């Protein structure tokens, strides 16, 4: 039978662990509130940006097809894909990171490229020859400029024909207990998906004038829209591994 001294030490150890756990909970709750507040603050901007793009798309010419909509077909039938993978900078998240990485490896082929955000993803894939770029700072402190840094090279390679498709893989949070890995296509864009919503009664939107032309305006705004997707998801993403 354990002595009273050992029992006392065990009780004290459990109490200390509880204090640490409570402190971690308070910190993570604060980070979650801050991240969600930041997301809500920037959401109107990116909503308006998407609305702007959807109003430009109908004015684009059918020919030539803008590169962002170009569905390429290679002779070998093997498209060159890039995957932007959003993971955490910490590993205390159970399946949060593992499910994202599992989905990546299930979908990727040998000729694909990986652009990894977060230290966990980098550590898991650092020996994989398909890893071409990593952003270990991107998960902890996301910003619009960092989101641009993450996407600009992949977008340039798509426009030049080095890449045929670009995908984003991240964790979609359903609620406090449920999440799932999700893969969405960034490029080529789906023209039908970007059509403007029908204008209702009292809609303040008027006719749009595109200067110098629709092609140029779309060329400038579409990358910003994609940067915003990365940034917005990152704001929510950073709070989850410490919840």
Language model features with spans:
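C-terminal beta-strand-loop-alpha-helix "lid" module of Rossmann-like NAD(P)-dependent dehydrogenases
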Residues: 1-235, 239, 243
